[in-house]
Amino acid sequence: MLTKPSARILSFEEAAAAVERGAAFVDLRPIESYLEVHIPGSLALLYEFGPGMASRARDCLPLSLPLVLLDLGHGEPAHAAGSLRGKGFTVLGRVTDGVNEWAAAGGSPVSTEIVTQPQGRVLDVGDPGAKPGEDATRIPVDRLWARASELVDDEAITVASGYGVRAALAVGILERFGHEEVAVWQSG
């Protein structure tokens, strides 16, 4: 018998407590929406039906990282949860309208500036279509979690972006590791 995927609905307080204990918010919204406003350190995983999103998560994030899904109605969080669980992740549940709930609880959502000229260190995470240049630091997004500490915390970082999916995930990883000055450069 086939079972329908599910994701427990969490109150924002439950979700925030889980994140305080080490879980991560996963933002399922379109990349443009994520870059415009998001919870600092939340991880952008564009929801797409099929194996793409969950495979990207498996390649880029530790399986030991518990996940809390954020959605504003653009994706199907139950299917996203099922896909992520199928790759070995623990999905604690989902929060509807999480970014607004974060702000209502006194959190300060952040925006990621999209720049036309790079500022500070240029980071090439392997985003298809990006043209980061010869001087870019190359850390593929699937290695960034393990190598983010190699980057100086107080240094401005510009992530070279093509299509943006990997670049947006890199923004969240960098923020999670304490990098506050992160921009995206559409270099493609």
Give the positions of each predicted feature.
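Cytosolic catalytic domains that perform sulfur/thiol-centered chemistry
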Residues: 1-188
